Amino acid sequence: MTCSSFGKCGSCVLWEMPYDEQLKMKSEKLKEMFSEFDMPEIEVVHGSDEHFRARAEFRVWHEGDKSYYAMRKRKEDGRGVIPIEECKIVDKAIYDIMTPLLKEIEKNDNLRFKLYEIDFLSNSKGELIITLIYHKKVDESIAEDIKKLKEKFKNADFIVRKKGRKYVFDKNYLIEELNINSKTYKYKIIENTFSQPNRQMNQKMIEWAMRNSEDLKGDLVELYCGNGNFTIPLSERFNKVIATEISKESIEAATYNAEINARDNITFLAMSAAEFSKLYKDRSPLITKYDLKNILIDPPRAGLDDKSREFVNEFDNIIYISCNPETLQRDLKTLAKGREIKAFAFFDQFPYTNHAECGVILKKN
């Protein structure tokens, strides 16, 4: 991939390295990081190195009568942002609309004045949610201007935000479709809630988790379930599933997603990992009806805190999806004791960065 922003933008730090060398470098680094553990060869899973991001956020840079998208500078160039002409890592639907959208905004002082940021969310059908974030007072008068944008960009819905206020034109969600093991799953993805940014890699991660859980017995508990991204396909591998998430909005989406995918063996709970851990330890009637031998965790970058790690360690088998190898390494020092690491995968979610997403399957000896 080539991009006119390479060498200027601080996002794609590995821009000078061919993609196959990036994969080799990252996988070798992971191999060294986890050398203390007895585990199989690291499976390297990757997709396209361009047009892979279904979510993107850009600052807006105004100069005279022109406006530009802006990204943070490279570290060696100091703090701040720089204007960019294009971004080749974003989904094709986002890429195609970026320039024409900004040209329309430039023509309208009401839309342009104190526009601070533009966020994009896309789905596999090329539909978009575009969020305009302002550092000014915004009221209903902006509706006519947004209506004109919607007439121009018929595949997009718009959201206008300023501190404490939000206006939606016409909806704040997309329906995503993922093809997993030749079956289509549908997901409601709500703007400003977490969703996996790399659609292609997300499908491959879910397929990997399903493939490596085929022989697991008992029911499944999932922490940090979000909108049911892993929960819904994996529910086909287990008799019953109980899944928790602290975000009520995400739980509402997950419940809806289970319904539209005709999955009736999942119970979603709007609670933190700590709250669920207490229910489990207190042997709540809500919990005792499950045969909970398996747990799936997809925690934030901080990984598991001490209490969560202690709780997860009570389960026979663990499916751990990690967005931070350093905290994964720390957590495995506890979780790998008395368990065999049956599979370890590196998912290259973000080409041209040092980021490495990992998946680990641990089974009790």
Swiss-Prot record:
GO CC list: cytosol
Domain of life: Bacteria
EC number from the UniProt entry: 2.1.1.-, 2.1.1.35
Organism encoding this protein: Nautilia profundicola (strain ATCC BAA-1463 / DSM 18972 / AmH)
A Pfam family per the record: tRNA_U5-meth_tr
Protein name according to UniProt: tRNA/tmRNA (uracil-C(5))-methyltransferase
Keyword flag S-adenosyl-L-methionine: yes
Matching Gene3D superfamilies: 2.40.50.1070, Vaccinia Virus protein VP39
